[in-house]
């Protein structure tokens, strides 16, 4: 735990006791501050009480004595309208921050030069965060990873000079972190998302920009118009910017040509290394993740050789193109995190011949946008409520069956793929659907796929179960 010593002797209101809320309250208390915590969910309040946290309805609090409101990232700050606790704090002139800002202040107080990599983007930030942390650890660096992935930030070990921190930051967390100042800030991409919470694309992009605007080195993917504009603004302001791109060569920055990564500068481009043969980084989208992680690790002082070694041992993230096992020439891949068609596209574009398990609770638009990948699909195995609609979309473009369940789909796909004379093929769970018709969440769905694969006679499992 990181004691929040910067709030010693101060009274803090905290709203939001799910997720990181309890850890944040405990950090305030450990640092000598006083917390009054609340949540609209009575069960969360009861859990906090059981942890020894003082609770009370913030509507009844004396806001004249409160120094700060700590807000959970899931609580609306502005859109669609401010939460009532936000309105109370603003009326009283009380600052409103989140747990990432709490960490930033502790780092500034106790180890201002402890390397901090903060990563955001609409897509790819979890993989980039995990990859960056893995490479740093593999190179022998004392490394802590958390934020919007894994551990709540205040449960990490306290800042010391040589301890590296790698934090995934959502737009909600950035919005509550006014003084975020990473050693390396990474902005991967900006596409429409969370507009119900941020109002407009311009506001959403402006929030994302804050992370890199405060960075010593701003690492920015420039393959979309919003990020290009951010990079241009920061460069004009004299900030250090490392551009990354998948769509073409750069005069200064990092780019990819297929699986080969390059670093460009001073009028020349030099190869860094290749991603060829690294199964956990397969696919064009992972080339961007790898470029960003490489740039961040270089900013932290690693050599290209150390980065390449770390890449080659990266196990990947669970449920994101996760290689589960192999049976002869058939690879089994769990991409359960793909809960809509856009999220399935990277996996479908990464393999030449696919036995595709898809379906679940359908999203608007179905799989019509994936038609360009149908020639890659040897056969589709459709599950859940979406099966009839997906069958209608596929039509005669490729073979399909309505399997109903993941267990049946894995058995049938394994049988059919084993008989495929084409050579290496993949059985891919990439549902393009939510999971809630058959499973509690996409993680449970992914576990069901893993279990079905493990049950196949002769299967050679790949790696260990990852969180």
UniProtKB/Swiss-Prot annotation:
Localization terms from the record: Cytoplasm
NCBIfam families reported in the protein's UniProt record: murD
Role description: Cell wall formation. Catalyzes the addition of glutamate to the nucleotide precursor UDP-N-acetylmuramoyl-L-alanine (UMA).
SUPFAM superfamilies: MurCD N-terminal domain (SSF51984), MurD-like peptide ligases, catalytic domain (SSF53623), MurD-like peptide ligases, peptide-binding domain (SSF53244)
Similarity field: Belongs to the MurCDEF family.
EC number: 6.3.2.9
Molecular-function annotations in GO: ATP binding; tetrahydrofolylpolyglutamate synthase activity; UDP-N-acetylmuramoylalanine-D-glutamate ligase activity
Record keywords, A-Z: ATP-binding, Cell cycle, Cell division, Cell shape, Cell wall biogenesis/degradation, Cytoplasm, Ligase, Nucleotide-binding, Peptidoglycan synthesis
GO biological process: cell division; cell wall organization; peptidoglycan biosynthetic process; regulation of cell shape
Enzyme class: ligase
One protein family per Pfam: Mur_ligase_M
Reactions the enzyme catalyzes: UDP-N-acetyl-alpha-D-muramoyl-L-alanine + D-glutamate + ATP = UDP-N-acetyl-alpha-D-muramoyl-L-alanyl-D-glutamate + ADP + phosphate + H(+)
Binding site for ATP: 121-127
Listed pathway(s): Cell wall biogenesis; peptidoglycan biosynthesis
InterPro entries: Folylpolyglutamate_synth_CS, Mur-like_cat_sf, Mur_ligase_C_dom_sf, Mur_ligase_cen, MurD
Entry protein name: UDP-N-acetylmuramoylalanine--D-glutamate ligase
Keyword Cell membrane: no
One of the record's GO cellular component terms: cytoplasm
């Amino acid at each position: 735990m990181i004691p929040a010593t910067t709030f010693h002797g101060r009274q803090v209101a905290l709203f939001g006791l799910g997720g990181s809320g309890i850890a944040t309250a405990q950090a305030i208390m450990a640092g000598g501050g006083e917390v009054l915590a609340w949540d609209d969910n009575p069960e969360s309040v009861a859990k906090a009480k059981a942890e020894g946290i003082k609770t009370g309805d913030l509507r009844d609090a004396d806001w004249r004595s409160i120094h700060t409101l700590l807000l959970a990232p899931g609580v609306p700050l502005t859109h669609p309208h401010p939460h009532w606790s936000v309105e109370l704090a603003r009326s009283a002139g009380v600052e409103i921050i989140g747990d990432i800002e709490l960490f930033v202040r502790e780092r500034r107080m106790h180890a201002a030069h402890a390397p901090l990599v903060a990563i955001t983007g609409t897509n790819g930030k979890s993989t980039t965060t995990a990859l960056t942390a893995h490479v740093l650890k593999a190179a022998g660096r004392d490394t802590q990873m958390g934020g919007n992935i894994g551990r709540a930030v205040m449960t990490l070990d306290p800042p010391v000079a040589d301890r590296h921190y790698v934090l995934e930051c959502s737009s909600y967390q950035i919005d509550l972190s006014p003084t975020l100042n990473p050693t390396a800030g990474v902005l991967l991409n900006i596409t429409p998302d969370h507009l119900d919470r941020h109002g407009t694309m311009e506001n959403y992009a402006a929030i994302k920009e804050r992370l890199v605007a405060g960075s010593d080195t701003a690492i920015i993917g420039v393959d979309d118009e919003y990020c290009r504009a951010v990079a241009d603004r920061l460069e004009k302001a004299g900030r250090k910017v490392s551009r990354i791109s998948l769509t073409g060569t750069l005069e200064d920055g990092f780019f990819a040509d297929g699986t080969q990564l390059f670093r460009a500068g001073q009028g020349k481009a030099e190869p860094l290394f290749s991603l060829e043969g690294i199964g956990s980084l397969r696919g064009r989208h992972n080339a961007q993740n790898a470029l960003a992680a490489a740039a961040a690790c270089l900013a932290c002082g690693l050599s290209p050789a150390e980065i390449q070694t770390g890449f080659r041992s990266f196990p990947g993230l669970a449920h994101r193109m996760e290689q589960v096992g192999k049976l002869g020439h058939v690879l089994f891949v769990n991409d359960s995190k793909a809960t809509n068609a856009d999220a399935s596209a990277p996996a479908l574009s990464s393999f030449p011949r696919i036995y595709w398990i898809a379906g679940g609770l359908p999203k608007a638009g179905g799989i019509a946008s994936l038609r360009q990948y149908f020639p890659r699909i040897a056969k589709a195995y459709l599950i859940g409520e979406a099966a009839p609609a997906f069958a209608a979309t596929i039509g005669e473009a490729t073979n399909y069956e309505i399997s109903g369940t993941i267990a049946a789909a894995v058995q049938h796909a394994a049988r059919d793929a084993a008989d495929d004379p084409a050579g290496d093929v993949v059985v891919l769970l990439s549902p393009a659907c939510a999971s809630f018709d058959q499973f509690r969440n996409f993680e449970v769905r992914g576990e069901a796929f893993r279990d079905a694969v493990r049950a196949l006679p002769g299967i050679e499992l790949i790696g260990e179960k990852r969180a």
